[in-house]
Every structure is written in C-alpha cells, then in structure tokens.
C-alpha cells in the first residue's frame, strides 16, 4: 500500500472518532443541556429520613451537620447519623446536638462488620433504622447548598419513582487543582444525568442520593457487592435503577457541597477508589462509557497527526465542528449545574482528559483496597 494511504486512513480514523463523539453529545448530553423538569401543579410532602455515615468525622460533623438539621421542611423528617466505630469526639458532639435537635437520631456501631469493607454495613444499619420510606443520603463532609434540600429532593418522587439522583458539587476555591476536581465532578455528572435521562441510569453519588427503603430491601441491599469497599452508590444504582423508576434533580437548592482535596495525591487516591467499581458495571454501560473515554483519549493525538501528515485545513474543520458542539453543550450543562466559571477553561479541560485517562487508567485493573 502506498505510504500516503496510511495517512488517509489515519484521517478517516480521526473523522470516525469525531463522529462517535458527536453521537454522544447529540444522543446523550443534549438531554441534560436542554432538560426541563416537569412542572407540578401541587407540591407534595412526605416523611424523609436523612442518613449520614461517619467515622472519626467530628470536625466535619461540627461544620456540616447543622446544614442538615436546620432544613425548612413542612412535614416530618429525621436525621440519622451512623457513628461507625469512631475514636474521636463524635459521640459527645452528637449527644450535644441531640439536646437541641429532636429530629437527630444516632446509631452507634461499636463492632466492625467482618468481610464487609467500606461504609456499606453502617449505611445498611442506618437504612434499617430509618422510620420513613424515603431515605436521603449524604456524607459527613457535605453540607446542603440550601435549607430547602430535603423539600426539593423529595418533590421529585411520584407514583413510579424509587430513585432520585442529585448533584454533589465541591466548594469553589482558587487554584488549578480546584478547577480540575470540579471539572471532573461536572463531567461525570453530565454523563450519569444524561444516561439517566436516556433511560440508561448507571450510577449516582453518595454525597447526594435518595431512594426508597423498599427498593433497597427488595434488592437485598449491598449483598451483591459486599466484598468491595466502594460501590455503595454506583453499584447499587446499577443494580436497582430502571428507565422508569429513576429521576434526576438539578435544582440548585438540591445541591450538596463538599471540601475538595487539597493535594493532587489526595484526589488521585479518591479517584482510584471510585473507579475501582467500574469493572462491575453492566456490559452495556461499560461499552458506552469505555467507547466515550477511548474516543476522547484518541481525539487529540489523531488531530495532531492529521494536521502534520494529512492536511491542517481538513483537520481543523473536523475539530471546529466538535468544538462548536462542545461549546453549546458545556455552556448549557454548566449553567444547569452552577459551574459556569469553568466554561472559559473547557478547551484546556478537554485536552487535560488525555493525560487524565493515562494517570487513572490503572485503577480499572487494580484490586481495590478494603478500607472504610
């Protein structure tokens, strides 16, 4: 074969990669970009159990727990903190809070659950202790973005809804690392919200997630993956979510906020733990997510090669088509998730994803550690 033909094939490969990317933007991400929640004629209220698992989180509880305790909610609710074998002052702090907030209940765990790493056992105990059908989950290092978090999240439920996916954001701070963390959080949320809207829900985040007790016990809780430290959120949603029983809520009042990692090493450790569950996803989800990641990873190397060896005019035309599509989708999605300050950086983030996949790809084959 003539040497020139190889670079034609390379350019055609670049075009194919771009077409696949455009498919994801049009078929999946457009759904979130142009999403408008159904307007309800009458507001519903139902009892809610907020559940927070904590281990040696006294400082975070002191800082964030009041945000869950002072919610403006028109009907009965409770806040359950599962204090899982803490050695710090969590017990005494919670006892003081209970004197003021009668809706606060504490589940004290004083013995480790053998063979069940992570927070799945304490979370199961919290759900078992919950008085009400609707449970709303968050973490000790999270605070609701508004006093209407409970109210707005439970409004999402209707007769068929059993799972509600919320957005767990990070506090906005200065520095490149903060922007990288928030970009990755946004980019992940854009995917799982869009997939849910397309009838293919595959994950949620434990920082802001709600479901009904009945669906939890119907699927026997976390028994299918009790041996894995992570997965109390995404692997359960993978098991229990269907196109008809899952909804999203992206009202800004329903967001939760967390402190981002302070160093790249801390963030890398978090991502290693989170991505360790990806290998357990359903085959369709693994294929769709893997194909998207692969085409995103290959896009810029093929762009550079096409510019150098085929023809920069043609390569830049293909790049421009994808860029315009990205500009539209990212603007609308970032606006919906209150991440507009990231928008001027989106081209930088898009290029960064090439290096991101290299750094974190080993987590897909690495055995997860058995930690809380």
Predicted regions and their residues:
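Acidic donor-binding/catalytic loop of UDP-sugar-dependent glycosyltransferases
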Residues: 88-89, 140-155
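Cell-envelope/extracellular polymer assembly enzymes that use nucleotide-activated donors
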Residues: 46-49, 78
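Membrane-embedded multi-pass helical conduit in multi-pass membrane proteins
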Residues: 42, 293-368
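Catalytic donor/gating beta->alpha subdomain of glycosyltransferases that bind UDP-sugars
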Residues: 157, 163-189, 214-217, 221-285
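Short, acidic, metal-binding catalytic loop of nucleotide-sugar glycosyltransferases
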Residues: 66-76
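Short aromatic/hydrophobic "clamp" motif used to bind/position activated sugar donors
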Residues: 135
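A conserved acidic beta->alpha catalytic loop
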Residues: 83-93, 111, 142-143
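N-terminal membrane-anchoring/stem segments of glycan-assembly enzymes
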Residues: 1-44, 330
């Amino acid at each position: 074969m003539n040497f020139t033909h190889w670079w034609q094939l390379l350019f055609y490969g670049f075009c194919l990669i771009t077409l696949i990317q455009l498919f994801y933007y049009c078929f999946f991400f457009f759904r979130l970009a142009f999403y408008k929640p159904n307007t309800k004629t009458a507001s519903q209220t139902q009892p809610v159990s907020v559940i927070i698992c904590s281990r040696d989180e006294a400082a975070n509880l002191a800082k964030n727990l009041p945000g869950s305790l002072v919610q403006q909610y028109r009907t009965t609710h409770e806040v359950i903190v599962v204090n899982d074998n803490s050695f710090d002052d969590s017990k005494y702090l919670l006892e003081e809070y209970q004197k003021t907030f009668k809706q606060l209940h504490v589940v004290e765990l004083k013995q480790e659950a053998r063979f069940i790493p992570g927070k799945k056992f304490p979370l199961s105990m919290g759900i078992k202790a919950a008085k009400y059908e609707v449970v709303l989950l968050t973490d000790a290092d999270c605070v609701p973005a508004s006093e209407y978090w409970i109210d707005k999240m439970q409004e999402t439920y209707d007769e068929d809804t059993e799972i509600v996916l919320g957005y767990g954001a990070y506090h906005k701070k200065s520095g490149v690392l903060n922007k990288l963390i928030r970009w990755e959080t946004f980019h992940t949320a854009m995917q799982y919200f869009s997939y849910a809207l397309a009838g293919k829900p595959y994950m949620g985040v434990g920082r802001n997630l709600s479901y009904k007790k009945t669906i939890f016990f119907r699927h026997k809780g976390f028994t299918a993956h009790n041996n894995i430290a992570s997965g109390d959120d995404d692997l359960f949603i993978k098991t229990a979510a269907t196109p008809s029983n899952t909804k999203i809520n992206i009202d800004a009042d329903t967001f939760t906020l967390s402190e981002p990692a302070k160093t790249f090493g801390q963030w890398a450790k978090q991502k290693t733990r989170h991505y360790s569950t990806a290998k357990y996803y359903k085959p369709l989800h693994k294929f769709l997510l893997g194909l998207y990641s692969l085409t995103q990873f290959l896009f810029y190397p093929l762009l550079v090669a096409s510019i150098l060896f085929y023809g920069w005019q043609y390569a830049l035309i293909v790049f421009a088509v994808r860029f315009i599509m990205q500009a539209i989708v990212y603007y609308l999605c970032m606006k919906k998730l209150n991440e507009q300050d990231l928008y001027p950086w989106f081209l930088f983030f898009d290029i960064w994803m090439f290096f991101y996949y290299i750094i974190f790809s080993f987590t897909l084959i690495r055995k997860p550690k058995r930690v809380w």
